[in-house]
């Protein structure tokens, strides 16, 4: 959500910044609605002052025995109250209309974010690791992993497309990946582990920016709850409607959860394999911090995610997303893209975003600065640390052998109960 005071004071700059994200100017529309609401608020204030004055005069008239005059003024007060009630309803309706409009406008991009339309305009800023040189033509995981226990057909029979069922060592490897990532974030990187609910109310998704704009991408239950598309929703909403002490910041939360996405806009894309599923596991990182520390905190989170890829010896690159490819709530986003030899390309495996004060204003989350007066909006950040399914894909493709087996990375051996290779079953 945007600060209406900023739009009032710098409407041209607001429109200019919004145009970088491919949006038409909206400050005029916003200020017209805001002006109408403020005019009504001023009229209400004037009427309240008049009501109070007439009420005072009624008391004086009663003391002086002027009952008829007092009765006339009582009728005047009743008329004022009726008019105020009508104006209050109009003001509330205008306020709701303004808030609904503001809630559909994306965050503004940071100055260092490259301007562009889509992923073709993203900027690669770092690359790690050299792709493995195979002595055979590497396959896509969807072509050989079913023989190792990755069952798409059985999952489709019970749930439909974009679901997977894992058996035996494959299931254990999937579990090991998530557990290893969670251990890294909690034991090495200082995140507090959270076990959150998987169903949330509207206000939680509004706070992080998924609602109202992206309803079609979510699963909605009949009792008006929503399956979480990411643990970001739960972890960020921990501080909803809170005023935090600056000395308590940063707060860092992490969770390993299933995530659920309708993928309404992904028809025909990534229909094979694990890349795009309705249900998948992910380790999420969330940080709550001050405006002064948010950029440094974002880079720290990037490093937390990259360290896992390096420990798994998976080649990857870091990409700074352009204005047209960023998520709705982000002011700056880095994507980590892992090398998939079967597809002969890099694919996103983590997205780490600084959302500035955008989500904090939607959640009404503030902090008390140690120096100075008043409260200020916190900055929120989120990122994958990492997506479990896509990490499994990366391991399958990068560690595949010519005989169809897959060697398991050494750092996962402690979680595998002696299993060091996925064998054909």
UniProtKB/Swiss-Prot annotation:
A GO biological-process term: seryl-tRNA aminoacylation
InterPro entries cross-referenced by the UniProt entry: aa-tRNA-synt_IIb (IPR002314), aa-tRNA-synth_II (IPR006195), aa-tRNA-synth_II/BPL/LPL (IPR045864), Ser-tRNA-ligase_type_1 (IPR002317), Ser-tRNA-synth_1_N (IPR015866), SerRS_1_N_sf (IPR042103), SerRS_core (IPR033729), tRNA-bd_arm (IPR010978)
Record carries keyword ATP-binding: yes
Protein species of origin: Zymomonas mobilis subsp. mobilis (strain ATCC 31821 / ZM4 / CP4)
EC number: 6.1.1.11
Catalytic reaction(s) noted: tRNA(Ser) + L-serine + ATP = L-seryl-tRNA(Ser) + AMP + diphosphate + H(+); tRNA(Sec) + L-serine + ATP = L-seryl-tRNA(Sec) + AMP + diphosphate + H(+)
Alphabetized UniProt keyword annotations: Aminoacyl-tRNA synthetase, ATP-binding, Cytoplasm, Ligase, Nucleotide-binding, Protein biosynthesis
Major site of localization recorded for this protein: cytoplasm
Reported function: Catalyzes the attachment of serine to tRNA(Ser). Is also able to aminoacylate tRNA(Sec) with serine, to form the misacylated tRNA L-seryl-tRNA(Sec), which will be further converted into selenocysteinyl-tRNA(Sec).
Protein name: Serine--tRNA ligase
Family indicated by similarity: Belongs to the class-II aminoacyl-tRNA synthetase family. Type-1 seryl-tRNA synthetase subfamily.
Domain of life: Bacteria
